[in-house]
Regions:
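Short glycine/serine/threonine-biased micro-segments
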Residues: 146, 176-179
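Conserved class I S-adenosyl-L-methionine
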Residues: 169-176
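Conserved SAM-binding loop of SAM-dependent methyltransferases across substrates and taxa
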Residues: 179-188
């Protein structure tokens, strides 16, 4: 994992610990992080050079979140999740039954600003996978979490993928896929 990715993992994990003190569990935090990252990346894809239209209603875009703070932010984010969950197609599936689990508006604002500071689309698939895997690994190492999850060390993954030598026309599988580390290494 690169130093920049490690720094992002540390920053995001530290914030997770802050929220856990407020009763927000790791799973809820990861869920909220995923919703916010999706919205941020959709915003990035809407800008040049991508210029993609992901059909997110203007009042529920990433930019709309940045316009609020305090209790108004918490109200807007909760409404946004509910309304996006009613959307047709994949957008509705992503946000189905979504709820705001971060009840402290100041902490929600801080999380949004932290996500906004990064250019997520510019990161490679491997970098985003490393960050996600790093968060899961930190959760498993945390004695308070009791996650009971196990992670294959990166050097072992690399060695196994080198032995298998996957090619574009071959099918691979990972029946115990937790973090997707084997798939990311094979993709690489």
């Amino acid at each position: 994992m690169s130093n920049n990715n490690s720094a992002i993992v540390s920053k995001v994990w530290a914030f997770c610990n802050t929220l856990r003190d407020d009763g927000v569990g790791y799973g809820d935090y990861l869920e909220q992080l995923t919703y916010l990252l999706f919205l941020k990346m959709a915003h990035e894809y809407s800008l040049p050079p991508h210029n993609r239209n992901l059909n997110i209603p203007k009042e529920y875009t990433w930019e709309s979140l940045l316009q609020y703070s305090g209790e108004a932010l918490e109200v807007h984010y909760s409404l946004m999740l509910r309304e996006l969950g009613k959307s047709k197609g994949i957008l509705g599936q992503i946000f189905a039954k979504s709820q705001n689990k971060i009840q402290d508006p100041a902490k929600l604002y801080k999380l949004i600003k932290m996500i906004d500071a990064e250019q997520w689309v510019m990161m490679g698939v491997k970098d985003k996978g490393d960050i996600y895997e790093g968060l899961l690994e930190k959760n498993a190492e945390d004695t308070k979490s009791g996650a009971g999850q196990y992670f294959t060390p990166r050097p072992l993954i690399k060695a196994m993928v080198a032995c298998i030598n996957p090619e574009p026309s071959k099918t691979i599988g990972d029946p115990a896929c937790g973090t997707g580390g084997f798939f990311l290494a094979a993709y690489d």
